[in-house]
Amino acid sequence: MSTNRHASRAQSRQAALQVLYSVDVGRRAAELPSSEAIDEALASVAAHFELPDGAHAYARELSIGVARNREAIDRVLADHATNWRIERMAAVDRNVLRLAAFEMGWSGVPASVAIDEAVELARRFGADPSPAFVNGVLDAVARTLEARGEGRGESGLP
């Protein structure tokens, strides 16, 4: 992957995290964000940060994908986040985990790439313990997907 594409993808992930965080903290817990809410949040993010060509589309794809599959993603994360309920996690950590789990399970992104990018987002936006927490949970998810022969977008998370 070229450096420009990597930078664009990294910026897309950052924008998607900001969108997911925004719609997560601005809604009731049981309410799934709509495509319209995601588009509004993405427009707000794009108004404040310059996104390179293609980054906006990938950020939207990630945000919509996480929103549409949030319940399944949250079940998988809950199974792998020992002693942590999803709703009790820090909002940044919760959405970094959702984003990476979606990439591993539905987008065909290799687990190692999704985990590395998620740890970097946690380092940048989370609290001091966030990178280690995110790495541990996602490593467990990746091992489960690998054991099932999944994780390259063929079947998604259960």
Spans of model-derived segments:
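N-terminal interaction/assembly modules
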Residues: 1-158
